[in-house]
């Protein structure tokens, strides 16, 4: 007897104590009072009570609640797991019990029809017969079979007082041999927890309750090898030899000498017609003929172990009749091509005119959502082009058998030779049997489908392509191993190859209509190094082409390969297998290369087992087939298993070091403690963190756009001309050119753009080489007094921005209000602040003794030239002629205009490209001055005071006459 407990003390009660003595608190449920019988009750009531005609009257119940409560009700168990929980029992009146048991059991049930589960009675676990011993001939009990039972006794004989009881249990699943739970319209595989309460009464002595739990069989698809490849050889039959058919004598076989076996769904072997492949060429026709060749071109499983002769056609040369033994399997059907070897004079002709087809499924197991790649290799005798040349369909085959036989291996062999399993006809209706041999039913469900074009090389008539089909996400694992194969669900890949090139005429557009793009593959031919033609298809949610009628078309070869849909992949968990690909792309490699590590041996080539007994050697003999050049999957590190290896190529160590720099250690930022900061400071720092960040290079280039703020104290700074003469500052020479110091009263609106403080950048962040335009630029010159320190920036974009700003702010060449000076005399130059020259003008500096190729003008150049000179004015000697000894050249001529609205004055400069840089006025005029001055010094001072808040200073615009 198992332990039981009450609500007050769950584990304190002894296992051997009677339930009546347990410390159970009575439930506060009210008891129904028994009806008192009166002496004057009528005889009619006693009669009705005796006949029990009042079934609707409420009866007193001793047990109010009886149910099972698992500890983890939503868990999916596996083989070997423990199932823990409690049986809850609520008693309202004292009740005497014999015992209380709990049972964990699994069973298989097959219904007779789609709706029979509602009509058939519910079977008790005790009524379901257990599996019979090996060798015993016994049918399963009317579509029922028990998988296992694990029983535990919770309470023995005793009395239960009113109260609420909980009996804990711990049950165990077997270690192996349990299929996954499934419920469908024709059967079920279920696992139940059943609690049974037995009372010492003759009427309804047992009361039961049950709880359903779910089990998932753990299938590891990692160690599974791919299915064995199938090779089909088609050899021609001469038309002349076909007409000559002697009655006896020598015979010649025309079928391939290869025989391959594989599992095939039985529903595909219902028709016994032979598959024929015809070619309309003048040489003859291609055909596959055989006694055991079924509808799809594959042989059915023979019922006895005997030799099956191959149907052959006669020929001109002598040949021998060849037979091949059939291989019998106890629980599977066979998929074989039976043939005999070609002998005689026609061997060379047959080898040259043989069509070879090889189909390989590159994965033997997969998980839901995975992609199954399929490789097809064709060596044809002519050029074919079929846009639906390869059709790959993934389907699930369900098989149920309501009355299987439990036979041993010896009995199974015996049943193949006698009429035990397939009895003779008892009705005389040509094989019609009314026995239970027809209790098996099979169903097919197409899950997904993919199409791929088959285009052979016009040179060697060969093609190799790789396509794929996707397993739906909602697919459940393969179910096998049920006793007697009462219920089984298996997955197959059907590959249909159109060797005649006429399949498109039979599709009539039905292949692509209503279907969406499904699994994508890469398809190509051996003469194409890169596959460019994607495959298309459909899934279970869209229309899928019915391939049953296509398999009867001449020139169509089908094949079937079983794949296992599992729950785990040990290779993938270790990082050695391919990860599950995406829905929009299928890993596929042209030329037949794949990423399955089981297909690649340690020597860098494909295993010889694929080509055993085919007589043609490895397909790598084709010069266009280079699939063996790909490295195996196991050469890739763990980080590169997320995608197929052909696009995750890892370079060698030398290339890796050159391509990827060494990582730099970046220490974590030193964040101050904000607890000591004020709220205002924390808000300000939070706002700064929200500002967009800048990368180091971008920050260096953008910071170089700023210019230093000129200070009045630096107005007398003169750059060192020796640096310019040596050519050490050829990239930022324009920054050393002086500009007028802007006062707050006369500041230009563009000075604010140059106002931000400039932060020097490291030398490695600056431009490393000049442009061609800068190399063609002549060396700069230092002239006149400098009014601001030279800029430290060397950014070319900043120099270009300054030049554009200067051009935008310059006045037009000839303003609209231009009036030539009637006096023709020179004009007194203005001061650096934009007013006319006064006594406080700075003294001029001596010119530099070399000349540029073009004049460079700035705002303070008015200090060095006199006004009033028109375009027809006199020319002056060059400043370089007196110092450097150069020849005299004409100096640019200027016209001063003080009538431009909004400015103090403007000067238009007219010059030629060969003019030297303007020198101060002291270089051209004597100290006394010889020009005409329009304003006196007093008027100039008044004008300067009145224009203290004037807009920009005087500006100059060079004009070159060529």
Swiss-Prot record:
Any one GO CC term of the record: plasma membrane
Chain spans, region Disordered: 1-43, 225-326, 568-675, 689-962
Ranges of compositional bias, category Polar residues: 297-307, 314-326, 581-596, 929-949
Source species, domain of life: Eukaryota
One Gene Ontology molecular-function label: protein-macromolecule adaptor activity
A matching Pfam family: Arrestin_N
Compositional bias segments (type: Pro residues): 840-849
Cited SMART domains: Arrestin_C (SM01017)
Residue ranges with Basic residues bias: 237-246
Coiled-coil boundaries: none
Basic and acidic residues bias (residue ranges): 793-805
Biased composition regions of type Low complexity, renumbered to the chain: 696-722, 738-747, 830-839, 913-928
GO biological process: ubiquitin-dependent endocytosis
The family this protein is said to belong to: Belongs to the arrestin family. PalF/RIM8 subfamily.
Function: Required for the proteolytic cleavage of the transcription factor pacc-1 in response to alkaline ambient pH.
Name recorded for this polypeptide: pH-response regulator protein palF/prr-3
């Amino acid at each position: 007897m198992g332990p039981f407990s009450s609500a007050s003390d769950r584990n304190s009660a002894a296992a051997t104590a009677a339930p009546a003595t347990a410390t159970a608190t009575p439930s506060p449920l009210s008891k129904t009072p028994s009806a008192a019988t009166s002496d004057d009750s009528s005889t009619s009531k006693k009669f009705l009570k005796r006949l029990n005609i009042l079934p609707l009257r409420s009866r007193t119940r001793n047990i109010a609640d009886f149910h099972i409560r698992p500890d983890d009700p939503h868990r999916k168990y596996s083989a070997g797991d423990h199932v823990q929980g409690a049986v809850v029992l609520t008693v309202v009146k004292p009740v005497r019990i014999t015992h209380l048991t709990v049972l964990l059991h699994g069973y298989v049930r097959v219904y007779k029809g789609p709706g029979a589960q509602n009509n058939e009675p519910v079977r008790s676990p005790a009524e379901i017969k257990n599996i019979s011993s090996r060798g015993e001939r016994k049918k399963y009990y009317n579509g029922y079979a028990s998988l296992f039972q694990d029983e535990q006794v919770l309470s023995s004989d005793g009395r239960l007082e009113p109260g609420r009881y909980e009996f804990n249990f711990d049950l165990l699943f077997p270690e192996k041999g349990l299929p996954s739970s499934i419920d469908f319209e024709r059967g079920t595989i279920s696992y139940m927890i059943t609690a049974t309460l037995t009372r010492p009464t003759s009427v309804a002595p047992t009361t039961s309750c049950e709880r359903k739990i779910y089990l998932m069989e753990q299938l590891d698809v990692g160690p599974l090898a791919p299915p064995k490849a199938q090779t089909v050889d088609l050899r021609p039959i001469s038309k002349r030899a076909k007409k000559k058919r002697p009655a006896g004598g020598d015979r010649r076989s025309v079928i391939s000498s290869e025989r391959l076996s594989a599992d095939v769904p039985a529903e595909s072997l219902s028709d016994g017609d032979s598959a024929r492949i015809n070619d309309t060429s003048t040489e003859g026709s291609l055909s596959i003929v055989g006694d055991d060749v079924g509808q799809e071109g594959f042989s059915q499983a023979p019922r006895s172990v005997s030799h099956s002769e191959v149907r052959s056609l006669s020929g001109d040369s002598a040949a021998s009749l060849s037979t091949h033994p059939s291989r019998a399997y106890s629980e599977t059907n066979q998929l074989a091509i039976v043939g005999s070897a070609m002998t005689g004079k026609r061997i060379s002709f047959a080898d040259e005119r043989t069509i070879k087809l090889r189909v390989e499924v590159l994965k033997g197991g997969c998980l839901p959502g995975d992609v199954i790649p399929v490789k097809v290799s064709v060596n044809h005798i002519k050029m074919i082009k079929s846009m639906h040349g390869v059709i790959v369909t993934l389907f699930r085959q369900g098989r149920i058998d309501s009355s299987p036989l439990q036979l041993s291996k010896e009995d199974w062999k015996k049943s193949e030779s006698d009429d035990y399993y397939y009895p003779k006809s008892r009705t005389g209706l040509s094989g019609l049997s009314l026995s239970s041999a027809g209790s098996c039913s099979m169903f097919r469900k197409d899950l997904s489908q993919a199409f791929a074009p088959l285009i052979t090389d016009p040179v060697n008539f060969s093609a190799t392509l790789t396509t794929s089909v996707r397993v739906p996400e909602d697919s459940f694992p393969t179910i096998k191993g049920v006793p007697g194969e009462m219920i089984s669900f298996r997955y197959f890949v059907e590959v249909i190859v159109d060797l005649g090139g006429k399949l498109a005429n039979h599709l009539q557009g039905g292949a692509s209509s209503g279907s969406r793009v499904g699994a994508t593959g890469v398809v190509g031919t051996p003469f194409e190094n890169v596959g460019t033609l994607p495959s298309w298809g459909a899934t279970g949610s869209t229309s899928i082409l019915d391939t049953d009628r296509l398999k009867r078309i001449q020139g169509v070869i089908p094949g079937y390969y079983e794949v296992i849909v599992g729950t785990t992949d040990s290779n993938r968990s270790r990082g050695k297998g391919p990860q599950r690909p995406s829905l929009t792309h299928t890993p596929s490699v042209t030329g037949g290369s794949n990423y399955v590590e089981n297909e690649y041996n340690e020597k860098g080539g494909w295993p010889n087992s694929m080509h055993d007994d085919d007589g043609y050697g490895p397909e790598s003999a084709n010069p266009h087939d280079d699939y063996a050049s790909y490295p195996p999957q196991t050469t890739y590190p763990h980080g590169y298993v997320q995608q197929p290896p052909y696009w995750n190529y890892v370079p060698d160590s030398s290339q890796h070091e050159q391509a990827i720099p060494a990582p730099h250690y970046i220490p974590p930022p030193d964040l101050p403690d904000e607890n000591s900061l004020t709220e205002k400071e924390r808000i300000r720092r939070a706002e700064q963190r929200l500002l967009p960040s800048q990368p180091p290079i971008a920050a260096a280039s953008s910071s170089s756009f700023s210019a230093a703020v000129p200070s009045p104290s630096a107005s007398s700074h003169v750059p060192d001309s020796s640096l310019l003469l040596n050519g050490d500052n050829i990239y930022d020479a324009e920054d050393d050119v002086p500009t007028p110091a802007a006062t707050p009263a006369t500041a230009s609106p563009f000075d604010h753009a140059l106002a931000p403080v400039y932060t020097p950048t490291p030398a490695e962040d600056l431009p490393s080489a000049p442009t061609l335009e800068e190399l063609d630029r002549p060396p700069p010159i230092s002239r006149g007094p400098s009014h601001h320190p030279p800029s430290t920036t060397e950014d070319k974009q900043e120099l270009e921005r300054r030049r554009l700003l200067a051009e935008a702010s310059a006045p037009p060449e000839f303003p609209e209000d231009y009036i030539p000076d009637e006096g023709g005399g020179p004009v007194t130059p203005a001061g650096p602040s934009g007013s006319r020259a006064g006594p406080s003008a700075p003294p001029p500096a001596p010119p530099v003794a070399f000349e540029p190729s073009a004049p460079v003008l700035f705002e303070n150049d008015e200090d060095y030239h006199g006004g009033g000179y028109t375009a027809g004015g006199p020319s002056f000697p060059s400043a370089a002629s007196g110092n450097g000894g150069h020849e005299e050249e004409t100096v640019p001529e200027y016209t001063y205009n003080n009538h431009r609205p909004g400015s103090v004055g403007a000067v238009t400069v007219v010059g030629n490209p060969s003019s030297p840089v303007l020198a101060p006025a002291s270089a051209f005029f004597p100290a006394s001055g010889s020009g005409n001055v329009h304003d006196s010094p007093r008027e100039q001072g008044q004008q300067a005071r009145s224009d203290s808040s004037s807009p920009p200073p005087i500006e100059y615009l060079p004009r070159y006459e060529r």
